[in-house]
Amino acid sequence: LGAVLVVHELAREYEVKKLNAKLDAKGVVQNDEGLYSSVQLFLPEEIYVASGVTIELYNNQISSLGTRIEDYNVKWTCAVGKNMQRKFSITGTDDLEGDYPLIFTIFDDNGAQVATASTTLKIVEDLPEEKKSFSLLTIGDSLSCNTATYERLNELTDNKIIYMGTRGVGGSLTEARRGFSAANYLTDAPYTMEEPHEKVQPFYNEKTGSFDWKYYTEKTGFHPDAVELFLGTNGLAEDPTENGDNIVAIVKDIHETDPTLPIYLVHTIYPANQDGIGSWNNKGQALYGDRYKYDEDQKVFHLMTYLEETLKDENYLYFVPASICHDSANNFDTEEVPVNPHSDEMMEVPTDAVHPGRAGYEQIADCLYSVICG
């Protein structure tokens, strides 16, 4: 009887293995609960590329598979640009201005199509000189607190942007606060991470008990030509609803007062690799010690798709696809560490899980500027 049971169990395992192989061939992946779901791809309806700027789309960042997409075969199809191993790359030029269909396809090892997504690649002219002078107010978190973003925007606009805000980043004014989430901007949250300290952040109106754009503009006298809204990293969760709805609430409040004010909503970026996530610390205390790269990528992917769906009918709102156009595999600063405590062999490990190096902020600026040009 024991031998029969063993043979039966081996046969069952073989059938399960065959079933899993079929599911893999169809692009079906197993989640943590042991259930099966289809591969999800996301490309916005349009990708803007300003003349003189290079924009790249990264395979693992447009898919719910994350880095697991490396187990599949992928292809970009377009009349322009470069179909590369891990990305699609396109440099805008005056000669290439126009619209181009761009298709991304995933295949299994048998050559069967698993999933596909498409967008329109729009190569647009650089802003004319008279349009490079405009005022911009950035509402954000620590990802908007790096001078490299503003320096790159200044380079692209010949130093003509007027930055507005009650706080400063280098020589640029902003409303960026380290550690802040959209939820903080909806409440009477204080800000004490850096000088000057604030008892209550300036968008909060005590009378309405929430974020109030009209109150803010009347109090500060700032009336920008455009708003950049770059939030999402703080507050990321498996369920994007709460974080996403808080961002949506800010958009809706601004447009209730200024319905034609352009808002550039920047999708937050993917984190560093697992070494960066696992080793990021403050004086030896792990900051992301319990987090896993695949799970964090899922949170970013689903927040991006939630916002796109929820705000798809919002006028004068322009999504900036930094999440899929930022090279999260290479943009984080690294340091050399031994591969183990007793080895002379060294390896590169990211020094931060969330905040990229200068190249990352410049890539985000290129993406924002291209959308503005569009």
Segments predicted by a language model, with ranges:
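Conserved SGNH/GDSL esterase-like catalytic core that processes O-acyl groups on lipids
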Residues: 137, 143-239
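Beta-strand-enriched, solvent-exposed domains that form extended recognition/catalytic surfaces
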Residues: 21, 25-130
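Histidine-centered active-site loop/cap adjacent to the catalytic His
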Residues: 339-374
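Low-complexity, Pro/Ser/Thr- and charge-rich linker/hinge segments at domain boundaries
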Residues: 123-145, 164-165, 330-333
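Substrate-gating cap/lid alpha-helix
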Residues: 261, 272-325, 354, 358-365
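Surface-exposed intrinsically disordered loops and tails
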Residues: 174-211, 276-294, 320, 326-351
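Gram-positive cell-envelope targeting signals
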Residues: 1-22, 26
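Loop/turn elements at helix/coil->beta-strand transitions in domains of secreted/extracellular proteins
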Residues: 132-135, 158-162, 222-228, 257-264, ...
